[in-house]
């Protein structure tokens, strides 16, 4: 809702075998008004509840079991784990608001709903946030991306940041590609990438280390990194 089709088409180009279908719904009623001044005063306009509720009803098409996700800075943080959860659902409805926000009654009167947030910052409208959620979810659906292995190895797929990437040429301004990547030894490369993933996460996002379920070998690597962060 409230998002044009073009951004959806540009974020993930679906191949012919993909089973994803997205559709936007018009929330404006026949007079074209969907917002009004807030009760109690204050700046800006508030999206009215009734047009939103009617659009949700239209999108559900009689199936009240379809979950509705309201994009809101008050919602639970959207992350890779949540994206994976949404990608496994047959259908979802995403509601993005504009102006100062959405009449609370639209949320209160919607069964089977959840509020989600893409971060602690403010956007001019929810369309961008909606596109972010759709892109993160769609690429996890089998067949959407050409290489499913790339999804498995990406940052956050296992709760950690990804390892650094390199490509040709092997030297740029005096900086060489790590020699291990040129060795052809796939087991050693895999081990190096695992260590670099742990190092990246520990240095850049230590909060993720606390949330990750590390095995004994990974914990030892973290201990080594603590003793020698370079």
Language model regions located:
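S-adenosyl-L-methionine/SAH cofactor-binding core of RNA-modifying enzymes
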Residues: 48-98, 102-104
